[in-house]
Each structure stands twice: as C-alpha cells, then as structure tokens.
From Swiss-Prot:
Record's protein name: Polyribonucleotide nucleotidyltransferase
Amino acid composition bias (Low complexity), ranges on this chain: 727-738
EC identifiers of the protein: 2.7.7.8
Record's keyword terms, sorted: Cytoplasm, Magnesium, Metal-binding, Nucleotidyltransferase, RNA-binding, Transferase
Domain KH per the UniProt entry, residue ranges: 582-641
Gene3D superfamilies per record: GHMP Kinase, N-terminal domain, K Homology domain, type 1, Nucleic acid-binding proteins
Length: 786
C-alpha cells in the first residue's frame, strides 16, 4: 500500500526536525473498516496502523466506571515474518503490545465526557512495519483520530510524538538508528489549547542504555532542565498533529451523538451528606495511619447510610459516591488552603525511609525497601546469558538480558483477590522499573550474566513502582552487580483548583494511595544523583502546563537525593557475589573452532558440561561463557575448551596417557587431548606379539601410554605404544597389509622392523567423525572417476 490508496479522505502532518529531516504522518479514512464507528489508517514512513473505534449500543448502567478497552494487534506479516509459536499464528498480546495499550489508554480516557457508560473499544492493528519507525506513537495518534471520527463525546484530538535528545537537540519521531545516539527517549501526548499552547496529558520517558557512555563522551546528561526542555520541544509536533486530525475530522467525522450520562450522585444527595458528615470527615482525614483512617471513614459511611437511607431509599450508591466526593473535596481543600496533607505532612515531606540488604538466605541478592506503609522486597537472580529472554515480537530486539518482574498480591492492600498471571498494571509497573535501571547496568562484556529482578509489593500505600526501583537497586548491589550508579524513584502528585479566582497548583512529594486517587496527577520520576533515568506521567486533567511539570521535576530531584542517601547507608558498593551464584568466565576462541567445541550433534560440549558440572554458552563471535557455582568446575571446563580451540599443539616425541575411544581392524584410536586423537596401528598394539584382533589387547575406555611417532601434513597423528623396558619390538604388520591371494604357508615371518619413523604421507586413515587422525580402513586399490 501507499499513502494514496489508504482512504477516500486524508490529511498530512509534516514535522520539521531541521538537520534531522522531516517526518510526514498521514491520516486516511473512508476505505478500510467502514463498519466501525470511526476508522483511520495512520502512516509514518512504511509503518501503517489501522485504528477502529466502536461503541456499544446500550449503556452499562451497573458499572460505576467508564468501560473503555484498548487492544493492540501485532500482526507478524507486518514485518514479513511468520509467528514462531507452535500453531504459527499470533496468540496473546506481547509485552510491547500491552505497554502500547497503556500508552493509548492513558491520554484517551480522561478525554471522554464524564459519566459515559457505553462500552467503547479501540482496536489497533499493525498492518506494516518500517524497521526505522516504531508503531507505538503512530498508534496513539491513530486512536485519537478514529475516536474523533466516531461521533463519541470526545474532547480530542490528542497528538503524540516521540522525542529523542541527540547531539544536544530534540528530534521528533526519531528512527531506530537515531535512537542509538540518543541520551533520552520520551513519548509525549497532549492537546492543543484555544490560545495556541499545548497541555501535556501523558509522558513516558527513559534514558537509553547508551546514555552513560554518551555522557562520558561529552553529550549532555538528561538532567531535569534538559527533560523539561524536551516537553517544550514536543509542543510544535503535537500542535501540528492536532491540526491535521482536526482538519480531517471537519470533513469526515460523524456528528457527535447523544449518549446518556450517568452521574455518580445528584446534588441533593451530596448536600445531605455534606450537611451530615463534613466535620466528621475533616477530623478523620487528620488520622495519619492508613488503617485507622479508613476504619474511621467506614464508620462515617455506615452512619450516613443509616441516617439518610430512609430519605434516599434505593439511592444508597449515590450516598456512597457523594461521601467519596466529599472526602476528596476535603483532602484537596486542606492541601490548597493549609498546605497540609492527609497524614499531616507538608507538600515536600517524605515518609520515613528504611533500606536493608541481604534479607534472604541462599538467593543471589535481596533487599527490603520501605517508605511509610509501602514495603517492597527485591530479589535478584543471576544466570548464564543463555537464560536471557527470547523475544518474538515486532520489536527489533530479539532478546532481553535484564528482566524485571513486578508482583502486586492482594494482601499488599489488606484485601482478598485473584492471584495468578500478571495483569496489565503489573506488566506496566515492572516495565517502568526495568527502564529506570537499564541505563546503569553493566554491559555484557563487563558482566556476562542474565539478570532477573523480582519486586514483591508486600505493602502498598502509594508508589510501589518507585519503591521497586529502590529495592531493585539495593538487590542488584547485594548480588554483586556493578551498577554504574544507584537509582532511586519518587512519585509526585498534584492538587489543582480555583482559589480566589486563580488556578492554584500544589505539587506533592511521595504521594499516598489516597492522594493518588483524589489528586490530579501521578508523576513518577527515577534517576541517579546526576540525571533522570525514567519518568511517567498520568493525569486526570485535560492537560497540565509544562511549567508546572518542570517545577515538579525539580521537586522530585530534591526528594531523590534524600532517598539515595538512605540507600547508600545500607550499601555503598557492589557486594561480593553469593556462593550460590554462578561464576562466569569468558573464553575467546577463533570462530572457525566453534564447531570443534560443539562437536558432532553437541557431543563434545555436552561431555564437557557433564564431566565438569559447568554450563557453557557460545556466542556467534567466538565468545564462550563458562559458568559454575564453584571455581574448580569452571576452571576444568575452561581448560577443556582451550585444549580444543586454543591448544598447545602436540609434537613428535610427546608422551600421553590416552584413552581408547574407538577400535578398528587396523588399530585403535586414542584420545590425547579433547578433540585430538591419534592412531595406534595394530602392529604397535601387542608389545612385540602378533595381534590378530585389536580387541584382544585394547577396548574402548582403556588407558594406554603412547608416544607421538609422526604427524603428517594434514595434522594426523600416529602413535607408538610406550613399552616397558626390555620388552620386544612390535609384531609384524597386520595381515590386512599383505597383498590379497598370497599364502604364507609355513614360511618364517619377515622382519619388517619398526616403521614408526617412516614418512606416512597422506595414508593416515580418516575417522569420519570429525576427530583428528581417525577413520575407517580403505582398500589399497582406488578408482578415480573424472
């Protein structure tokens, strides 16, 4: 497909990146998926995404939330590939697809009219993938456009762009190749305001794995000031994307339909609840402890239902919703007017912090991090690189060495619930913590291990994801991982409202769960002492001024320094690796020797692993990683590998205590070194006695002392048996060496002497199994066919 045939109507957004060129994003509609309420094809380069928005006919009155669903369908044909699964078709969504769903949902959800209860589904299908252009940001814009066309009560359009900081400049929609040179990668979504400004609605950002190296080479570190400048730099691109979407909507959008809106409560219910319980709620919100505070609020709720139930019969849900709204109002008012939070802290105060490492036995690394009632256990496991995760997605990455898993069991909030496979929220939190630490991880060469980090949220009252960042840093250092710098994270909140005719914003440091629920923003920031490594912004507003976000970044920086001090008091440098962790040794061999180390059908490498107890992983460039839980096993495996691929070549006259590995009619093959065999001819086997059958003297597995008699031009080795002193010379050559058809009769045997020093030329038999100097016997007469 090309841009010209993707739809009947189309509009284009052109974004100028100066020296980095222009990016053209095209929105087309009217040809594909015409039965959906709204559909659009968005294209960037050769990346093509189809977005279809549909809406349920009947509202779900029983729901007390907006039933919006976003699905991303990664089609492997988009990259010209067949799925690697058993059934050769796409199955459950990949982690990349789930994270893209969350990227789309976060700016989209607050843009719908409040109280909408009709089911809305947005399905994104990746039809074609340009290796240079990721599909995720294209999908956000496509979702906004298809929803704008659908006739739903939607306040969009929403524009989204990826911004990369490259050579001191911010580049919109960078290619994969350009991202290799970036110190910071940021996805920003927002909407254009009537005054021409842009309100930021969502941010997902991280430093790259190359950041530390690039900064050491002179690039600008992604400090709070640099990140804030990136938010400003994203505005022109967002404005242009919103313009193109608005123009297409003017000619192709359906009229906005009337949908029933279900308010949580009516004004009379709210007024009755406020008159009865406002003072009690205000007192309850002064209780610092979460459990005690919630218990007091539950008592107030029970009294409200009891006292007002008869008056509002059948409307008990309204009373509960009104009480929640009253609680939210009191929390926000107290912060805005008195600068006092639920637990009595000021806007910049952090809850009590504790950090401890080495809390579990036997595991490779462990740590416990607590911030108030939020408690995270971090556990680190190290293994061979062959245990890294293989990826079968549309992403250009095919494996992942660092894996971060986040678990949020129901008991962490004192509740019951389902325990099992991770939900989208858990996948998203784990990915955020993973991205926060990737920039400070050692390279494969510096630390040749696969690393799995697990964060167990044992207690939750605000920002378990940022607690996971702190616990992970501690756990990794406890396991002996040489991080380039420790990383800490903090969650920031926002309360905003009209106060004396002006909009006032108060940024909160280290938010509680209730402040997250009642506030306007969840802004998570992670980083080192020097720069930001990851951040994530979710908002319930239509947008937040960028200067407010810039101030929040600076406030987060101050909090991060405090947390890092507590963490460094627990552990300052990487600890000694656990006795239970594998020790990995690196061996470099010539690429053409890889096959020798592996052996036929893996026999050689399997034998080394079985006999030494070590694990061996071989890279395509000839790097071999040898891992074992004890030093002698690893050293034995390294010596075996070196003997094969980096050997000290044997010389004529060298003696070995070898092992018989194969017998034939003409002699025995003796293993001298791993991968190095020699032929002990039948005439040399019997210590001067005539030998009719090799097996009468030697069998597979027998040990025999031999001396190298000759090495021919092809490297094949011929052996003499080392005989005890005074023993007779070897028997005459085997009968198979005599010309056929001659009868010796009773003639005395002819003394042929010892032929060990005779030039053998290329007569050495070939074993045929890849070993040195081996093979089957051959007839003397050969016919050459031309």
């Amino acid at each position: 497909m090309t841009e010209s045939n993707l739809g009947a109507q189309s509009r284009t957004a052109t974004i100028d990146n100066g020296a980095f060129g222009t990016r053209v994003i095209t929105f087309s509609t009217g040809r594909l998926a015409r039965q959906a309420a709204g559909s659009v094809v968005a294209q960037l380069g050769e990346t093509v995404v189809l977005s279809a928005t549909t809406v349920g006919r009947q509202p779900k009155e029983q729901f007390d939330f907006f039933p919006l669903t976003v699905d991303v369908e990664e089609r492997m044909y988009a990259a010209g590939r067949i799925p690697g699964s058993f059934f050769r078709r796409e199955g459950r969504p990949s982690e990349d697809a789930i994270l893209t769903c969350r990227l789309i949902d976060r700016p989209l959800r607050p843009s719908f009219v409040k109280g909408l209860r009709n089911e809305v589904q947005v399905v994104e299908t990746v039809l074609a993938l340009d290796p240079s252009h990721p599909y995720d940001v294209v999908a956000i814009n496509a979702a906004s456009m298809s929803t704008k066309l659908s006739g739903l009560p939607f306040s969009g359009p929403i524009g989204a762009t990826r911004m990369a900081h490259i050579d001191g400049s911010w580049v919109a929609f960078p290619t994969h190749e350009e991202l290799e040179r970036a110190t910071f990668d940021m996805v920003v979504a927002g909407r254009a305001l009537p005054d021409g400004d842009v309100a930021i609605m969502m941010v997902e950002a991280e430093a790259t794995e190359h950041t530390v190296k690039l900064v050491a080479g002179g690039a600008s570190a992604p400090t709070e000031e640099v990140v804030a400048s990136g938010l400003e730099a994203a505005k022109p691109a967002i404005r242009e994307l919103c313009r193109a979407q608005s123009e297409l909507a003017e000619v192709a959008a359906k009229p906005v339909a009337e949908f029933p809106v279900f308010l949580d409560y009516s004004d009379d219910a709210y007024q009755a609840v406020a008159d009865l319980a406002r003072s009690d709620v205000a007192e309850a919100l002064k209780i610092a402890g979460k459990a005690d505070r919630e218990e007091a609020l539950d008592r107030i709720k029970a009294r409200v239902i009891e006292d007002l139930g008869p008056r509002f019969e059948g409307r008990e849900k309204e009373l509960s919703a009104a009480l929640r709204s009253l609680t939210k109002s009191e929390v926000r008012s107290r912060v805005l007017r008195e600068q006092v939070r639920i637990d009595g802290r000021g806007p910049r105060d952090i809850r009590p912090l504790t950090a401890e490492v080495g809390v579990l036995p036997r595991v490779h690394g462990s740590a416990l991090f607590e911030r108030g009632e939020t408690q995270i256990l971090g556990v680190t496991t190290l293994n061979m690189l062959r245990m890294e995760q293989s990826l079968d997605t549309l992403s250009p990455e095919k494996s992942k060495r660092y894996m971060h898993n986040y678990n949020f069991p129901p008991y962490s909030t004192g509740e019951t619930g389902r325990v099992g496979s991770p939900k989208r929220r858990e996948i998203g939190h784990g990915a955020l913590a993973e991205r926060a630490l990737i920039p400070v991880l050692p390279s494969r060469e510096e630390f040749p291990y696969a690393i799995r980090q697990v964060s167990e949220a044992l207690g939750s009252n605000g920002s378990t994801s940022m607690g996971s960042v702190c616990a992970s840093t501690l756990g990794l250092l406890s396991a002996g991982v040489p991080l380039k710098a420790p990383v800490a994270g903090i969650a920031m909140g926002l309360i905003s409202d009209e106060v004396e005719g002006k909009t006032r914003y108060v940024t909160l440091t280290d938010i509680l769960g209730a402040e997250d629920a009642f506030g306007d923003m969840d802004f998570k920031v992670a980083g080192t002492q020097e720069f930001v490594t990851a951040l994530q912004l979710d908002t319930k507003l239509d947008g937040i001024p960028s200067d407010v976000l810039a101030a929040a970044l600076q406030q987060a920086y101050e909090a991060r320094q405090t947390i890092l001090e507590v963490m460094q008091a627990a552990i300052e440098a990487p600890a000694t690796m656990s006795d239970y962790a594998p020790r990995v040794t690196t061996v470099k061999i010539p690429v053409d020797k890889i096959g020798m180390v592996i052996g036929p059908k893996g026999q050689t490498i399997n034998a080394i692993q079985d006999e030494t107890g070590a694990e061996i992983s071989i890279e395509d460039d000839g790097t071999i990683y040898v891992g074992a839980t004890n030093g002698p096993s690893a050293q034995a495996a390294v010596e075996r590998v070196n003997a094969i691929a980096n050997p000290t070549l044997p010389k004529v006259g060298d003696r070995f205590l070898g092992t018989v590995v194969k017998t034939a009619a003409f002699g025995a093959f003796v293993s001298l070194l791993p991968g190095r065999d020699g032929l002990l001819h039948i005439s040399k086997v019997g210590d001067g006695k005539r030998v009719e059958k090799v097996e009468d003297y030697l069998n597979v597995g027998d040990k025999v002392e031999v001396e190298i008699a000759d090495i021919d031009q092809r490297g094949k080795i011929y052996l003499d048996k080392v005989r005890p002193e005074g023993a007779e010379g070897p028997a005459e050559a085997a009968a198979t060496d005599r010309p056929a058809g001659r009868d010796r009769g009773d003639r005395a045997p002819r003394d042929r002497g010892d032929r060990g020093d005779r030039e053998r030329g290329s007569r050495g038999p070939d074993r045929g199994d890849g070993g040195e100097g081996g093979g089957e016997s051959r007839p003397r007469r050969r016919t050459r066919h031309s």
